């Protein structure tokens, strides 16, 4: 998906990172089991964050094992899975499918069309199971596409619609925590959308693609404007997050929310300001485990 909910590894304890990594690898294994290699390819920071948060909140009974994977055959990784991992895998696969469909719709990316087609077939069993969620998400995406077609530059409006998608993703159960999870997912979705739009605006304008910031990206105060918009939504997300009774994973989840989530934004801001260096996390080898990104800093799918 988007890949902004990543850890700031230098600020983590080793045991916190190992715990996070075990959820990441667990999600990877379930994606492969349920959706094959295509599902495994969709593995994302977003899915790992969702999985880690819900597993802690609902105190799911973990099954812990070790395995080697194709990417790192010489090293065994701890794998942590439970019933919540299944849900996170379902949401990860569905949102990846919608993202690939959007890539094909916007840019005619052949890879997006192929992966979306494969995922469409592999997620058919989820259509009835999550019919209500899918209906809300599909409607929000359709509304976003209509705004794009109109050319209207409305960053808050677009962020609001993507927030509706993520609200559905985080609403795991109809219970006492649903209202907080919905608010959290909604605001996190807005943050992620705005960060992605900020990072991509120059490339989008150059290639003639829609971007909600295209009217303001040349302003001298653009970074401050975008940062302020994002901060408002992130603060509201954090307020909802802190109302959840999280224990085991709360430290690394806070690391992501209060620090890691800003890494790519700060890199993009540094490039635009012409800075020779940017003070950001050195998230180790980008091809290793949950820290792998492509050459542009975007997240890649892959194994644990």
Q: Each predicted region: which residue ranges?
A:
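Low-complexity, proline/glycine-enriched hydrophobic segments characteristic of transmembrane helices
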Residues: 274-282
